[in-house]
Regions:
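N-terminal ligand-binding lobe of clamshell/alpha-beta domains
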Residues: 1-300
Length: 300
């Protein structure tokens, strides 16, 4: 099989199922595991990822309003790679290449590849995606084992918290810094599984723009900053700077952490289990292991 993955989560699922050698192409954002970094890239982004949060947001909105795609597919490269399976997504047209663009291009390839969209917006949905990918690439047993492993890890966190009768802090998770967005989809469930209460969103709901007043009025006792696509260093640097602004004076004294959103919360794949364990270590540090310094850093 010749697999092209157009999203990091798909790439991570394929790798976790032991089919890394069948990947022949990936998106420009696929960086884990490190072995995929040498594979041909079949997508590009029209927005400078190193620009400021507000500049990125404005450019994405401008492009979307113009009707142009934020992400482009390299048709010639895709044709050269001759994939038999393309993994895509239906979740967000400003997060990855749209399913419609993929199907349009796939229809002119000869032979036509199977196009498989990943649709999960909750942990259960992500588990279903893993099973579906496993079936598509002939790795059903590995997929079932991976889903069971993820469930077992989440269960261990739950049982530890339950046995300790740990209090449930009020948690606000910020997915974008300017404008502010509350994290949605699977993130509220990550918080709940890690022992907290998400005060800004419900599991499965879309990420939504919020103002700082709403965050303040939600009375969080823990602030988590996990900007979509930012690594830990950038997340920590820009989130700490945000907390120093006058609009956030009310948050003085509230514990705050920066999270590697690029690795943990932006990708609906196997590492969501790592995300739960990381958040649990922040939420209940006296009960569960401290989070890895590679994934989280306290900023206040």
């Amino acid at each position: 099989m010749r697999i092209v993955s157009l999203l990091p989560a798909g790439t991570e699922i394929v790798a976790a199922l032991g089919a890394l050698e069948e990947l022949v192409g990936v998106s420009h954002e696929c960086d884990y595991p490190t072995a995929v970094q040498s594979l041909p890239r079949v997508t590009s982004c029209a927005v400078d990822p190193h620009a400021s949060s507000i500049a990125i947001d404005r450019e994405v909105r401008r492009i979307a309003e113009s009707g142009a795609p934020v992400f482009a597919l390299d048709a010639a490269q895709l044709a050269r790679l001759a994939p038999t399976l393309i993994l895509t997504q239906t979740l967000c047209d400003v997060c990855a290449v749209s399913e419609g663009d993929v199907r349009e291009l796939g229809a002119v390839l000869d032979p036509a590849p199977r196009i498989l969209p990943l649709t999960g917006t909750t942990l259960d949905g992500v588990s279903r995606d893993i099973v579906i990918v496993g079936e598509a690439i002939g790795r059903s047993a590995a997929a079932t084992a991976l889903v069971h492993e993820i469930a077992a890890r989440l269960r261990r966190v739950h049982e530890t918290l339950k046995a300790a009768r740990a209090p449930r802090p009020r948690v606000a998770v910020i997915e974008w810094l300017d404008p502010l967005f509350a994290a949605g989809h699977w993130t509220p469930e990550l918080v709940r599984r890690a022992g907290g209460v998400d005060v800004l969103a419900e599991p499965g709901a879309h990420s939504a723009e919020v103002d700082v007043g709403r965050i303040r009025d939600a009375r969080p006792t823990l602030l988590l900053f996990a900007p979509c696509g930012f690594d830990l260093a950038r997340s920590a640097r820009e989130s700490a700077a945000l907390l120093e602004t006058p609009a956030w004076e009310w948050a003085a004294g509230i514990e705050a952490w920066a999270i590697d959103g690029n690795a943990l919360t932006s990708r609906p794949g196997p590492r969501l289990a790592d995300a739960v364990e990381t958040l649990a270590g922040i939420i209940a540090p006296s009960i569960l292991p401290a989070p890895s310094a590679a994934y989280a850093r306290r900023i206040a």
